Amino acid sequence: ALSSAASDVYKRQDLCVIQFSSGSTGAPKGVMLSFNNILTNLKIKTLADEITTEDTLIHWMPYFHDYGLFGNHLVCLYNQITEIKIEPFSFLRDPLIFLKKIGFER
């Protein structure tokens, strides 16, 4: 449920963001996502991935990519868990940095 302060600012059906498709099969298209769309997605991902407050998420996806933003960053904020982000170019230069970072963070 929305807090009373949040519900004064926006309604669940209000437009939250326009997410552009990659355009891999044509011109990129803007997809209108409501607050409800995003909150529902976050809830489903939380349940499907069995995320708990004890979890830490490590990833290298940029925030301009939909999964980097919605599937990683916002999931961490929504669940109030630790997010460790590896810069994408660092990962591309040295993919083993991912495993090194996991070892370091344990």
Where do the model's predicted regions map?
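Short, well-ordered beta-strand segments
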Residues: 16, 56-58
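Conserved AMP-binding/adenylation subdomain of ANL enzymes
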Residues: 39-56, 66-106
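Conserved sugar-transfer catalytic core signal across GT-A, GT-B, and GT-C glycosyltransferases
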Residues: 5, 17, 72
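AMP-binding (ANL) adenylation modules
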Residues: 61-65
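Single conserved hydrophobic/aromatic residue that forms the stacking wall/gate
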Residues: 1-10
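Conserved AMP-binding A3 loop
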Residues: 16-40
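Short secondary-structure boundary/capping segments
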Residues: 9, 27, 34, 73-79
